[in-house]
Amino acid sequence: MSSSTLLHLLLLSSLLFSCLSCLTNVEDEFSYIEGNPNGPENWGNLKPEWETCGKGMEQSPIQLRDNRVIFDQTLGKLRRNYRAVDARLRNSGHDVLVDFKGNAGSLSINRVEYQLKRIHFHSPSEHEMNGERFDLEAQLVHESQDQKRAVVSILFRFGRADPFLSDLEDFIKQFSNSQKNEINAGVVDPNQLQIDDSAYYRYMGSFTAPPCTEGISWTVMRKVATVSPRQVLLLKQAVNENAINNARPLQPTNFRSVFYFEQLKSKLGVI
């Protein structure tokens, strides 16, 4: 039995017998289930302030293909400086997120400093890479002083446990065993995340959930990290029934440029 099949079986049993929060949730404002009245194809019609979800021309996520990128060596490795800081875990009903209380460090893009604010998790992944959708995606949301946003995305496939999520497992379990939607997680270190910035994609897009705000700088890591089936199961158990698979469908690229950086190597080592 594959790990993916096992995950689905465990998830079904957990929803039937132990997901107490699913029994008491009222209908959500939006759903990830295609075909539902409040599903992804209808997000733009649910509220006037969500109109961009249906009419925006630079929406995320998108399909990333190596044969449709513009190579740009001037991008360079990410200039990031993260630090351990107090954080809380929040269950929005649609996803589990890490919300940093203090200064968790920053990322610099085009000489603009973006502070790390929170980390969202989506399963399966929202972005696809060369036709493949992965088991999990972590999205690190950053904001600048003038309210510009930048998201760093890490794609995961099943394998060894992710060290960052390993530190949070006991807290995530509490969401599926109680009515809590916010838990203090103590000091959380974003450096535990498996970020390999030797190769990545860069494009302009949007947030992937309503109100689907555009003008977001996306950086998607080329190297895929690993996460255990158990860790993904815990994230799925925590959310509402209509967000178990909380990945927005792929959006049209609409002739946007997707840039690609890869650190060059020579016989003497990395250039």
Swiss-Prot record:
- Residue positions of the active site: H94
Indicate yes or no for the key word Transport: no
Instruction: State any single GO MF term.
Output: zinc ion binding
Per the database entry, which stretches of residues form a coiled coil?
none
Q: Which residues form the signal peptide?
A: 1-21
Entry EC number(s): 1.6.5.4, 4.2.1.1
Instruction: Give residues annotated as binding L-ascorbate.
Output: D95, H120, F121, H122, Q139, T208, A209
GO BP terms: carbon utilization; cellular oxidant detoxification; cellular response to carbon dioxide; one-carbon metabolic process; positive regulation of gene expression; positive regulation of phagocytosis; response to oxygen radical
Q: Does the keyword Lyase apply?
A: yes
This protein's UniProt keywords:
Allergen, Antioxidant, Disulfide bond, Lyase, Oxidoreductase, Signal, Storage protein
Which pairs of positions does the record mark as disulfide bonds? C53-C212
InterPro entries attached here? Alpha_CA_prokaryot-like (IPR041891), CA_dom (IPR001148), CA_dom_sf (IPR036398), Carbonic_anhydrase_a-class (IPR023561)
Activity regulation note: The carbonate dehydratase activity is not substantially changed by the addition of Zn(2+).
- Free-text tissue specificity from the UniProt record: Expressed in tuber (at protein level).
Residue limits of the Alpha-carbonic anhydrase domain?
Answer: 28-262
Report quaternary structure and partners: Monomer. Homodimer.
Protein function: Storage protein of tuber. Involved in protection against oxidative stress. Has carbonate dehydratase, trypsin inhibitor, dehydroascorbate (DHA) reductase and monodehydroascorbate (MDA) reductase activities. Catalyzes the reactions of carbonate dehydratase and DHA reductase independently of zinc and glutathione (GSH). The coupled reaction is capable of recycling a plant antioxidant ascorbate using ubiquitous compounds H(2)O and CO(2). Exhibits antioxidant activity. Able to scavenge 1,1-diphenyl-2-picrylhydrazyl (DPPH) radical. Exhibits immunomodulatory activity.
The family annotation for this protein states: Belongs to the alpha-carbonic anhydrase family.
Name listed for the protein in its UniProt record? Dioscorin dioA3
Organism of this sequence:
Dioscorea japonica
